[in-house]
Amino acid sequence: RSLKALAQVSGLSAPSVGERLRRLEERGVLRGYTVNVDPRAFGYQLQAIVRIRPLPGQLQEVERQIIAIPEFTECDKVTGEDCFIARLHVRSMEQLDTLLDRINVLAETNTAIIKKSPVKRRLPPMGPVQP
């Protein structure tokens, strides 16, 4: 949204909105701005969630491989039996197999194809902390 649009919604002037945004950026509350692109527009028809459990001694190499494969669009290091949970965007099942083959020599994987995302990426509530 433009500063003018934000000002109208918030009931503030555009310069006031601009100043508040600048202060939030300086404090690190706002870390940046992004564009929301639909991966399907670039041929990425499938998304998968991959649980990854590195083989003994392979943790660092698995992490390097995940970072090196750009189709992995998100990855979290987690507690539990698996070490990583990652999101992957691919154009086909064949591409999925090819990419997973690079990981499967270093780790056990469990893959689920995403059918639908009822909750899109969103922020948690921003209100005051409840006791």
Annotate each predicted stretch with a short phrase.
Residues 1-131:
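A compositional/biophysical signature of low hydrophobicity enriched in polar/charged and small residues
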